[in-house]
Amino acid sequence: MAPSGSLRIPVAVLLLLLWGAPWAHGKRSDVRIITDENWRELLEGEWMIEFYAPWCPACQNLQPEWESFAEWGEDLEVNVAKVDVTEQPGLSGRFIITALPTIYHCKDGEFRRYQGPRTKKDFINFISDKEWKSIEPVSSWFGPGSILMSSMSALFQLSMWIRTCHNYFIEDLGLPIWGSYTVFALATLLSGLLLGLFMIFVADCLCPSKRRRPQPYPSRKLLPESSQPLKKVEEEQEADVEDVSEEESESKEGANKDFAQNAVRQRSVGPSLATDKS
């Protein structure tokens, strides 16, 4: 009989654990987990989102209040969620998380930052009394769905990827710290060179440069070889014509001189004949 009595206690403990496990699991499911893959669900409906880190003392103190508030989510028709910034660095950049914990209220894609007391009662009053209407929403330029915040998210993800690679080089491959920095420096130079070449190629294709042709110096046009003999003949004919005209002009000048001399002689001879007759 003693052994049967001793078996009752472990069986009772086992039944208690089996009954309590689903209850505890259902309680944890009241707070939804938001990641980079499903964050766009926040754009529909009403949400309260907490950004936290496991190592943050203030975040640890907030967790019981947040879990209790999540139990009222169905009655208040609000979704209660949380984001672990250590596992989702892209979301921390997308929402510009500069302090922990940070709480956002979202209503149909409009985000407002909650800065009130962090108790269950205050959270419930904030939703039931619609106190969020008195808070100015985040500008569309800095909204999580904007191009600027998407770029910021990509930058945060890149920084986390670089950190992971750095740890892999040091811990798994055994490289020294300066060796890891050297790898990143070479990768940065190579990526910058490739990016610069790509940008130059795109700029040259979109806006080609207008190359100015040099103006030719003034020069005489050279005739083809086939026309050179004809040109020589024309030049010789022009030279002959010029010689003939010069000879004609010289002969005319000589004739004029002779005519003038004869006229002078006749005038001088005339008076002398008259004196002889007298």
Swiss-Prot record:
Any one Gene Ontology BP term: regulation of calcium ion transport
Modified positions (Phosphoserine) in chain numbering: 226, 245, 268, 272, 278
GO terms for MF: disulfide oxidoreductase activity; enzyme inhibitor activity; protein disulfide isomerase activity; protein-disulfide reductase activity
EC number(s) from the headed UniProt entry: 5.3.4.1
Location in the cell: Endoplasmic reticulum membrane; Mitochondrion membrane; Secreted
Cellular component per GO, a single term: endoplasmic reticulum membrane
First-level EC class: isomerase
Gene3D superfamilies linked: Glutaredoxin
Intrachain S-S bonds: 56-59
SUPFAM superfamilies in UniProt: Thioredoxin-like
Its membrane topology: Single-pass type I membrane protein
Stretches for region Disordered: 213-278
Domain Thioredoxin: 27-132
Protein name: Thioredoxin-related transmembrane protein 1
Gene from which the chain derives: TMX1
